[in-house]
Amino acid sequence: MARPLIISDCDEVLLHMIVPFGEWLDETQPVSFKLIGNDFSTAIRDKQSGEPVEPAEIWRLLNLFFDNEMHRQSPIVGAVGAINTLAQHADVVILTNLHDKHNESRRAQLLAHGIDFPVFTNQGPKGPALQAILEKYQPSKAVIIDDLAQHHGSAKEHVPHIDRLHLCGEPTLAPHITCGFEAGHAHARIDTWEHALPWLLSRL
């Protein structure tokens, strides 16, 4: 008999990302990091000129971080216990927007924190990837957990029958991002695992 399926994002859902990324930049790179609101495009600035770096340089730095610095990421409060509790009631997979070359390192990173589930890497909107995962698992029910409203919008477009929880566990970022629930893409917006877990269990 098919089980329910939880499809969870990683960065800012299970593990902190923006804060350790910014700390690494400030410590080791000729740039500073200060996120004002949710405008990532102007958050990274040259330390000498104060000018924002070019988009290509942002991507280079992000890739460098994921190549070498993922050990800096730590779990969101309550995430490890909650996701493993959910695994007692459903299958769990991780759908993370990273280059495919980082799949194994993400898997190992999560495993080191006690999160032992299949990892699917993706680039761009998550709707098509969600569709493929659902075709593979054929779950009785499914729920996606993600911190970005646009991925809930893509999920609603491609797999509208699944439940969608907008969760951003990074308190410095959560107040500033577009709310997937308010936008009509997610069924709920809950930013702490303490309160998200009962909601998720009720959906299974």
Language model features with spans:
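Active-site neighborhood of HAD-like aspartate-dependent phosphohydrolases
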Residues: M1-I58
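Short hydrophobic segments within beta-strands
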Residues: I7-D9, L95, I145, L167
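Metal-dependent phosphoesterase signature
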Residues: R45-V80
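Short, acidic loop-to-helix structural element flanking the phosphoryl-transfer center
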Residues: D67-I94, D100-R107
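Short, charged, surface-exposed secondary-structure boundary motifs
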Residues: P128-Q131, L173-F181, W199-L201
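Acidic, Mg2+-coordinating phosphoryl-transfer loop and its flanking beta/alpha structural elements
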Residues: I144-A188
